[in-house]
């Protein structure tokens, strides 16, 4: 079966549980039509570059699937009809990348927040202030 990756954005006023419920719902739609979800990720609420339906932010979700095209078309149709889903993007891939997506890796790096040892900045001089 072909491999697909899906990203969808849902409205910002949904709770995290409702957004994750949408992921579960669309995973079930794929399973009911003969496909399977290989991996799913909830990326959280992110600010968008421009407003969509008067929303500046949205809940982002990412699915990796192994499904026939009919199952993907049905899932996309239901996503576009769903009032809470603002945007959908589906791409066909040759193979799924191993491990977490780039977005999740960025989030893990941000959560660590470790800046390490900062070396003493010797170029400032001992006075600290402006040099003339």
UniProtKB/Swiss-Prot annotation:
InterPro entries: Ribosomal_bS6, Ribosomal_bS6_sf, Ribosomal_S6_plastid/chlpt, Transl_elong_EF1B/ribsomal_bS6. Transmembrane segments: none annotated. Residues 105-132 have a biased composition (Basic and acidic residues). Residues 96-132 are annotated as: Disordered. One of its GO terms (cellular component) is cytosolic small ribosomal subunit. Keywords: Ribonucleoprotein, Ribosomal protein, RNA-binding, rRNA-binding. It holds the Pfam family Ribosomal_S6. GO terms for molecular function: small ribosomal subunit rRNA binding; structural constituent of ribosome. Binds together with bS18 to 16S ribosomal RNA. Belongs to the bacterial ribosomal protein bS6 family. This is Small ribosomal subunit protein bS6. It comes from Cereibacter sphaeroides (strain ATCC 17025 / ATH 2.4.3) (Rhodobacter sphaeroides).
């Amino acid at each position: 079966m072909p491999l697909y990756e899906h990203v969808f954005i849902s409205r910002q006023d949904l709770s995290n549980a409702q957004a994750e419920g949408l992921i579960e719902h669309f995973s079930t739609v794929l399973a009911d039509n003969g496909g399977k979800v290989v991996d799913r990720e909830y990326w959280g609420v992110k600010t968008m570059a421009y407003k969509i339906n008067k929303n500046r932010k949205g809940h982002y979700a990412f699915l990796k699937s192994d499904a026939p095209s009919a199952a993907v078309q049905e899932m996309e149709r239901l996503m576009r009809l769903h009032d809470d889903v603002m945007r959908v993007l589906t791409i066909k891939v040759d193979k799924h990348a191993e491990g977490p997506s780039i977005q999740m890796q960025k989030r893990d790096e941000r959560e660590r927040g470790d800046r390490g040892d900062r070396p003493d900045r010797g170029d400032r001089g001992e006075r600290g202030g402006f040099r003339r």
